[in-house]
């Protein structure tokens, strides 16, 4: 039996200080986990997906071959529970989020002239799971979180957080 688990994100992070952008970055990352089960024995592997299909396929096949060999050399897994159904699910949460290109322009005009400090995390996260019994599960969501502080002239702070899936500019 083979179980595949996928996790990934495509997200943006922007750090603000004194109502100016101090740091920004994009994350485009995905990982694949493999679990090989044979004769009550369990082996696991995982790697970061490169996006190059041929390279990623070769790495996956190499790991499966390694786990096949390793599974004959390890003791049985006393906690092994095998899936018994082939149920599948798919949930994709669409959002009217903040595009990466528009994020800074959406925030800076509203905080101009204010001592605004914070971080924006914005983007999509993915999770998937499949096995050779036919189970397939996929979850995808888009969200944002703007965690910020407003600093007064006397150095007092008001903390706030604006988070969700649909950005409301008003």
Residue ranges, per PLM feature:
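Glycine-centered flexibility motif
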Residues: 19, 31, 118, 123, ...
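Acidic low-complexity segments
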Residues: 2-13, 55-139
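Hydrophobic side chains in beta-strands
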Residues: 6, 36, 120, 150-152
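Broad gene-expression machinery/nucleic-acid interaction feature
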Residues: 13, 29-33, 42, 132-136, ...
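Internal alpha/beta scaffold segment
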Residues: 43-45, 51-83, 114, 141-170
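N-terminal alpha-helical targeting/anchoring segments
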Residues: 12-69
């Amino acid at each position: 039996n083979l179980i595949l688990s996928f996790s990934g994100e495509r997200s943006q992070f922007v750090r603000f200080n004194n109502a100016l952008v101090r740091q920004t970055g994009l994350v485009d990352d995905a990982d694949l986990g493999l679990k090989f089960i044979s004769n009550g024995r369990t082996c696991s592997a995982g790697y970061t997906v490169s996006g190059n299909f041929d390279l990623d396929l070769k790495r996956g096949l190499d790991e499966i071959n390694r786990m096949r060999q390793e599974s004959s050399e390890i003791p049985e897994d006393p906690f092994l529970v095998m899936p018994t159904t082939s149920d599948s699910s798919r949930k994709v949460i669409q959002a009217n989020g903040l595009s990466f290109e528009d994020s800074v322009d959406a925030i800076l005009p509203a905080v101009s002239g204010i001592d605004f400090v914070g971080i924006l995390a914005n983007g999509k996260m993915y999770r998937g799971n499949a096995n050779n019994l036919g189970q397939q599960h996929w979850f995808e969501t888009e969200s944002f979180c703007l965690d910020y502080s407003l600093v007064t002239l006397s150095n007092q702070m008001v903390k706030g957080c604006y988070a969700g899936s649909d950005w409301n500019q008003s």
